[in-house]
Amino acid sequence: LEGIDLAEGAFDLAYSSLVLHYLADLGRLLAQVHRALARGGRFVFSAEHPVYTAPSRPGWVVDAEGRRTWPLDRYSFEGPRAVEWLGARVLKHHRTIGTTLTLLVRAGFVVEHVEEFAPTVEQVAADPALAEECERPMFLLLAARR
């Protein structure tokens, strides 16, 4: 994706799901997507939330009382993070929310929606295991317009 070259004005919608945090040069891709969208076209994407990608040792920490917390360190130190995922070592690129929004604006986008995903009360009631997801956002959802 980092080397992709898209035709100018060819699309009304671009969508990406849980990919952008793997790219080292997000700015170049955003410029390509902006160029490829027709005027008024929309770019909608999800990415792992920076609170999720930042920690040097991601994973829940359980204290003596059994309370689970998500460790947050190195948030302002952007760059690659090597993590274990499904038995393999993968490289993610951590960026703050501010950096992601700035890159979108620099590429020419107008940001229309930003959501730090958390399950609803109804979703937690249906699946109590989701309750821990209310303690830290795992996903960042954005919509932007050309």
Where are these regions (language model features)?
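Adenine-nucleotide cofactor-binding loop residues
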Residues: 1-2, 51
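A short acidic, Gly/Pro-enriched loop at the edge of an enzyme's catalytic core
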Residues: 2-13
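A short SAM/SAH-binding and catalytic strip from SAM-dependent methyltransferases
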Residues: 12-27
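A short glycine-rich, Lys/Arg-flanked "PGG" loop and its adjoining helix->strand segment in the class I
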Residues: 27-42
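Conserved class I S-adenosyl-L-methionine
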Residues: 42-80
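Acceptor-substrate binding/catalytic loop of class I
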Residues: 47, 51-54, 58, 84-99
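Short alpha-helix
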Residues: 79-80, 91-115
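Core SAM-dependent methyltransferase catalytic element
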Residues: 107-109, 127-146
